[in-house]
Amino acid sequence: MEVKDLKPALIWQCFDEITKVPRPSRHEEQIRKFLLDFAAAHNLAAKTDAVGNVVMTKPATPGCENAPTVILQAHMDMVAEKNNDVKHDFMKDPIDTYIDGDWVKARGTTLGADNGIGMAACMAALIDKDLVHGPLECLFTVNEEIGLEGAINLGEGMITGKILINLDSEDDGEIFVGCAGGIDTTAIFHYRRSVAPEHFHFLKVSVSGLLGGHSGGDIHQGRANANKLIARFLWGLSQEHEVAVCEFNGGNLRNAIPREACAVFGIHGEAKQTVADALDAFAREIQGEFAGIEPSVKFDIESIERPAYCIDSDTSLRLIRALYSAPHGVYSMSRDLPGLVETSTNLAAVKMEEGDTIKVTTSQRSSVESRKFDIAHQVEAHFQLAGAEVSHSDGYPGWAPNMKSPIMKIAAEAYEELFDVKPAIKAIHAGLECGLFLETRPELDMVSFGPTMTGVHSPDEQLNIPTVEKFWRHLELTLAKVAKS
């Protein structure tokens, strides 16, 4: 069986088509054309704004014309992550999907169920002739994964409804009514090139096989950070030997826990075997520390040719110290909602860049606005102590829970009616676009829900098939209840 053959047919057929269209962040041209072609093929009104967001509208079911307009919202872009041994061009290749038991997966890449299944639900709602609903507006935003840019720059008048259902959540049985705000902090190290010592032996050390995951939704899992592990190993070596660091690269995305990292470094030739022994001991140490959490962590080391140059010793030492000691993970838990992470930080990526610079990207989140800035400023101070230039993104606000929300009540009643169990009403430690919509439309009544998926923002991403049917039925009944309210 293929993905397009799954039931309910409409949502799975739409999702299957979406997986064939390249749509990494900042490159939504093809998926936008796909959406506009879809609208034209089904005689749906559609419009775009200056940044490329798309809205499609559908008239109410006959007899429901006076019902309130509902906005269904999802984002177009996907996180483009792949394993190092996988050949895949996210700019032109379709996602290679397959079914494994109750799960839809992708071979060696992110699946894009975040937020492809939300897009598919919007599309299915637009063409389902049996759906009962009031006026519908389906909003597809751009560049959500790199800072919620589509929501930040949403064109005036693009949406008119006062009820919004965000379809970008990842846990069946949970209805979200709040989310964290976020801000990115970037540190730039400038270095001088120094001649690679002739009497040094040069090696490349790497770590792979980590689970990674979403820097909001998975940060509480205590998973290993590839950048931290490589920095820790190099720092340990530097306590006993002179280490000449030539390269350091790890992670890719601000909102993903880094799964892989590597460094090129030199050490006195006679210490070559010492390094191999040290890595073996370090690997055993890490496997013990993360037993039951990181079952597939793998370290590799190989000899390489002497590089043209290394990072100057002063910058090299400051960089390794800063990465090793940088904060990462959960900073504090919510005192109001048990089990909810309040504040966190993610040491997301380290990249060698042009102009003899090294760029360190971090991402901070908090459901308390002042603490969002506090943790960002702590990260700033940390890297300033290491001599880096530090800057912050504009950030985005959180979404404060409204426990008296009418749409929350309707969505909860619909779920319980269908499945004979009360859904959990929650806030999420991740950035949803809802908080940004509230800034310009404070009257909006909003919820977020979706099917179960795990491993998002990593090649381990998978979408649970049975919960997609539940998600669709939940959306159907919620829309019908709003139409009849």
Residue ranges and their predicted role:
Residues E2-W103:
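Acidic/His- and Gly-rich active-site-bordering loop/insert found
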Residues K7-I11, R335, E342-G355, S363, ...:
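Zn-dependent metallopeptidase/amidohydrolase metal-coordination segment
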Residues D16-K20, V264, K298-C310, A348-V350, ...:
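A short beta-alpha structural unit
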Residues C64-I146, A151-K162, I188, F202, ...:
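Active-site metal-coordination/substrate-binding segment of hydrolases
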Residues L136-A226, L234-S238:
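Fold-level recognition of mixed alpha/beta catalytic cores in primary-metabolism enzymes, strongest
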Residues G157, R223-E240, I267-K272, T315-Y324, ...:
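His/Asp/Glu-rich mid-to-C-terminal helical/loop segments that flank catalytic regions of hydrolases
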Residues G178, V195-F200, I219-N249, G269-S344, ...:
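Acidic-enriched catalytic cores of C-N bond-cleaving enzymes acting on peptides and small amides
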Residues N225-N227, R232-F248, S393-G395, P401-L444:
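Active-site-adjacent substrate-binding region
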